[in-house]
């Protein structure tokens, strides 16, 4: 296993779109009422746009893309818009590796934020395991943050 977490280009958009679709559609196994996902999760135009905006990242294992992320940096805060791993690679440490790399890539960031659906038992447990703390919730989502002192 030779893992790398890298910025994705527009040439990676098709692969990342396919993985995103498989990953989010698999949420029916952990509480989703039907297949589906966040806005643009299964469209090439969305992933291409995110790559052009330098917000799309890829997780590569031995030259094969196995996952991705959307990251939005603003000042000292990073919003993890989403991460996704090909279901073939679930429960093999890829998500943990990706989140560790995200935190390491942005040493200036003091607050990492993200949200996940209330019904998704898999992702809620995952983010809590990584030290993310619930800061609020609404009818649909749980909002998490992880703060660090950069001084």
Residue ranges and their predicted role:
Residues 140-151:
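Terminal substrate-recognition subdomain of acyl/acetyltransferases
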Residues 4-18:
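A short beta-loop-alpha structural element at the N-terminal edge
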Residues 18-46:
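Conserved GNAT-fold acetyl-CoA-binding loop/helix
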Residues 44-58:
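A short helix-loop-beta-strand connector motif used in the catalytic cores of GNAT acetyltransferases and
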């Amino acid at each position: 296993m030779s893992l790398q977490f890298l910025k994705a280009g527009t040439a990676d958009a098709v692969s990342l779109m396919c993985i995103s679709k498989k990953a989010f559609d698999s949420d029916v196994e952990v509480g989703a009422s039907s297949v589906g996902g966040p806005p643009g999760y299964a469209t090439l135009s969305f992933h291409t746009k995110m790559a052009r905006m330098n917000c799309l990242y890829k997780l590569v294992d031995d030259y094969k893309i196995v996952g991705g992320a959307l990251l939005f940096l603003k000042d000292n805060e990073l919003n993890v818009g989403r991460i996704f791993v090909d279901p073939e690679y679930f429960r093999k440490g890829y998500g943990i590796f990706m989140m560790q790399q995200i935190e390491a890539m942005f040493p200036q960031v003091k607050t990492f934020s993200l949200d996940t659906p209330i019904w998704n038992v898999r992702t809620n447990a995952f983010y809590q395991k990584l030290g993310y703390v619930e800061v609020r919730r609404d009818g649909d989502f749980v909002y998490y943050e992880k703060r660090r002192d950069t001084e």
